Amino acid sequence: MNLILEFLLLVGVIIYSYLESLVKFFIPRRRKSVTGQTVLITGAGHGIGRLTAYEFAKQKSRLVLWDINKRGVEETADKCRKLGAVVHVFVVDCSNRAEIYNSVDQVKREVGDVEIVVNNAGAIYPADLLSAKDEEITKTFEVNILGHFWIIKALLPSMLRRNSGHIVTVASVCGHGVIPYLIPYCSSKFAAVGFHRALTAELDTLGKTGIQTSCLCPVFVNTGFTKNPSTRLWPVLEPEEVARSLINGILTNKKMIFVPSYINISLILEKGPGFSSKHPHGGSQQPVTPIPGDLTPSSDFLKH
């Protein structure tokens, strides 16, 4: 029965992908210019953050790059400068509230108002729940969601005054579905998706329609935090593909950026009738979506 349901899901995904491609071909979304705008990217020392910085550098944005890894973020900055961008580098621990507030104040003094912020810094410690260390659970939430609160609280006032800006939350498909051995990570990403949605609603209520929000939700990204990743329907992505999708989503003011895009319909179909997940010991787990495939977590610590 599971194979039949997966086949139907695959058919739905294929149909959706073709229809989406046709719509994009005949009705392309208008792209905005970010040339000269100040863009703050956290977790810019490698991975998605680094490659997103490259994409903004190609757009001739002015970059403010944060990372806890000085060497990594300096390497990112060097490449961005070669691409023609003006770059400012800050070594920041995004799990430290005081450090975040102090760094934002420094950015305001030395660079000016931030017009686009990409909250990308992330932490993950794969383990079953009982093996997860308390300090690792705490660190996961400090970086993956609490850091978002402190950064936006510090940057939002100037955006509200101007009624202009763009707030980007880097979450994950794990903010919509679940996977074993990543309970703290999945929980923090559910919180990140909720943060994006609640902030979007609040800005709309305030009438601040000039402030855009986007949330990036990729599936598994090849950043080395899992061993032998394999999925039946969802691919393992390269960071370059995710960064390109993110910049395209930002330039078109897309609210929810799924990578690949058919993940959206996949999640909807899996939550529909007949697609409820079964607990290994029996029973149903609706409406939470299990992520298909088999991922064996490594012991590596990941920062985006």
Curated annotation (Swiss-Prot):
<dbReference type="GO" id="GO:0046889">
    <property type="term" value="P:positive regulation of lipid biosynthetic process"/>
</dbReference>
<keyword id="KW-0732">Signal</keyword>
<feature type="active site" description="Proton acceptor">
    <location>
        <position position="185"/>
    </location>
</feature>
<comment type="similarity">
    <text>Belongs to the short-chain dehydrogenases/reductases (SDR) family.</text>
</comment>
<feature type="binding site">
    <location>
        <position position="189"/>
    </location>
    <ligand>
        <name>NAD(+)</name>
    </ligand>
</feature>
<keyword id="KW-0597">Phosphoprotein</keyword>
<keyword id="KW-0007">Acetylation</keyword>
<dbReference type="GO" id="GO:0005811">
    <property type="term" value="C:lipid droplet"/>
</dbReference>
<keyword id="KW-0560">Oxidoreductase</keyword>
<dbReference type="InterPro" id="IPR002347">
    <property type="entry name" value="SDR_fam"/>
</dbReference>
<feature type="modified residue" description="N6-acetyllysine">
    <location>
        <position position="79"/>
    </location>
</feature>
<comment type="function">
    <text>Plays a pivotal role in hepatic lipid metabolism. In vitro, it catalyzes the oxidation of a variety of lipid substrates, including 17beta-estradiol, retinol, retinal, and leukotriene B4.</text>
</comment>
<dbReference type="GO" id="GO:0005783">
    <property type="term" value="C:endoplasmic reticulum"/>
</dbReference>
<feature type="binding site">
    <location>
        <begin position="40"/>
        <end position="67"/>
    </location>
    <ligand>
        <name>NAD(+)</name>
    </ligand>
</feature>
<feature type="region of interest" description="Disordered">
    <location>
        <begin position="276"/>
        <end position="304"/>
    </location>
</feature>
<keyword id="KW-0256">Endoplasmic reticulum</keyword>
<dbReference type="Pfam" id="PF00106">
    <property type="entry name" value="adh_short"/>
</dbReference>
<feature type="binding site">
    <location>
        <position position="172"/>
    </location>
    <ligand>
        <name>substrate</name>
    </ligand>
</feature>
<dbReference type="InterPro" id="IPR036291">
    <property type="entry name" value="NAD(P)-bd_dom_sf"/>
</dbReference>
<feature type="modified residue" description="Phosphoserine">
    <location>
        <position position="33"/>
    </location>
</feature>
<keyword id="KW-0520">NAD</keyword>
<keyword id="KW-0551">Lipid droplet</keyword>
<protein>
    <recommendedName>
        <fullName>17-beta-hydroxysteroid dehydrogenase 13</fullName>
        <ecNumber>1.1.1.-</ecNumber>
        <ecNumber>1.1.1.62</ecNumber>
        <ecNumber>1.1.1.105</ecNumber>
    </recommendedName>
</protein>
<dbReference type="GO" id="GO:0004745">
    <property type="term" value="F:all-trans-retinol dehydrogenase (NAD+) activity"/>
</dbReference>
<dbReference type="GO" id="GO:0006629">
    <property type="term" value="P:lipid metabolic process"/>
</dbReference>
<keyword id="KW-0443">Lipid metabolism</keyword>
<feature type="signal peptide">
    <location>
        <begin position="1"/>
        <end position="19"/>
    </location>
</feature>
<dbReference type="GO" id="GO:0004303">
    <property type="term" value="F:estradiol 17-beta-dehydrogenase [NAD(P)+] activity"/>
</dbReference>
